[in-house]
Design a protein with these regions (language model features):
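Glycine-enriched, solvent-exposed interface loops adjoining structured elements
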Residues: 1-227
Length: 227
């Protein structure tokens, strides 16, 4: 991604869009809060596409006999969990709550399945040892108190969503009409949701067999050394 803008640039564009360039009715601090909330909404839309617009981060978990392990403070959502053996990684399957009894009663020293639960990752059976790699999407940066030089990636003009949504909030507080910006916001959202699916051009999105024995963490031929 290369289309980046600073927080002060986004703030200026939002003021221009709301026709409040020289107005002190909305302070910069308050506008930063609007922008931060709008950025988080754009972040949600891009994550929902299922494609990696934001670089996943890895957390190392060491089994100690417990079932649950705290996720990092900057956690948004889990991509996958792998069990490590040497230089190889074996993918764990995600379990549904209705399947819990099957796995917690299974015994064994190594976890075979995982589940993201609140601020924790559940591994079952509770591993008494071993190393696990938790790959997750980080949460969006809180721009409320960020420096003016903080950059925002607009990908392909999608920063306009943040600009228009922040302008809408400014006009809303001023009790001015928001009809025009709401119409533009809807058009932008539809465009982003459609085009966000086109991040990978060479390989079409496909259904993955997650119940096959080949995806079980006990099978060596499904190893992976990298994400």
């Amino acid at each position: 991604m290369a289309r980046t803008f600073t927080l002060i640039q986004i703030r200026t564009r939002a003021r221009e869009r709301a026709d409040m360039v020289n107005s002190s009715f909305i302070t910069d601090s308050e506008l930063n809060g609007y922008i931060s909330a709008s950025y988080a909404e754009l972040y949600d839309i891009l994550v929902q596409s299922g494609l990696l617009y934001f670089t996943p981060t890895a957390q190392t978990i060491t089994g100690n006999g417990s079932e649950t392990y705290a996720v990092p403070s900057g956690y948004y959502g889990t991509v996958r969990v792998d069990r490590q053996e040497g230089s190889n990684f074996y993918p764990l399957q995600e379990y549904m709550i209705t399947e819990r009894h099957v796995h917690e009663n299974g015994g064994g020293s190594e976890a075979r399945v995982y589940s993201a639960q609140g601020s924790n990752i559940s591994l079952l059976p509770a591993p008494s040892s071993g190393t696990y790699r938790h790959i997750y999407i980080p949460a969006p940066v809180d721009l409320t108190a960020s420096a003016d030089s903080t950059t925002i990636d607009g990908v392909s003009g999608w920063e306009e969503y943040i600009v228009v949504d922040a302008a809408r909030k400014m006009l809303q507080k001023e009790e001015s009409s928001t009809t025009g910006v709401e119409r533009d916001l809807l058009r932008l959202k539809e465009r982003i949701e459609e085009m966000a699916q086109n991040r990978a051009w060479s390989t079409p999105r496909r259904v993955v067999d997650v119940r096959s024995d080949k995806s079980d963490s006990a099978n060596w031929w499904r190893t992976t050394g990298t994400l």
